[in-house]
Amino acid sequence: FDYLAKVVGQWAKDRQSETTAVLVRDRSQRERVVDALHERGVQTRAVGHGSIPPGAPVVMTMHRAKGIEFSKVFLFGVSSRSIPMGIKDYDFDKDEGDQALLRERSLLYVAASRARDELVVSWTDQPSPLLSASVSSVAASTS
């Protein structure tokens, strides 16, 4: 949460707060992120249903962000434990598992493509396997 607070706090100082979003996997994670940022002095607004309130960076689920563009996006918690979610439940049916994996991949694409100018992706422990090729190419290009 400290790195998230540092990045989002800097974006807010740069007057980018109204075009900034933190995207998370689910509603419970959204609430944890809002609380953690508040504890670190970074004001955000949780967005569920309805319009997006002006004045502060928003925190919303990846699903909720569909169709909305932001200047800067922080994808929080894109770890192997959270994305893809529930794929093991389809181990008994390959076709259903393939469809579920495609939906998870599409969700991650939608979330990442909400960023117009800057995208930051974070994870704990291991990154999502859906990021592995991208993470490898970024790591190679920055070393």
Which stretches of residues belong to each language-model region?
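Helicase P-loop NTPase motor core
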Residues: F1-T44, G48-I52, A65
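Conserved helicase C-terminal RecA-like lobe
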Residues: Q16-T19, M60-V135
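Short, aromatic/basic amphipathic alpha-helical patches
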Residues: R32-G41, P129-T142
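A short, glycine/Asx- and small/polar-enriched loop/turn
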Residues: P53-V58
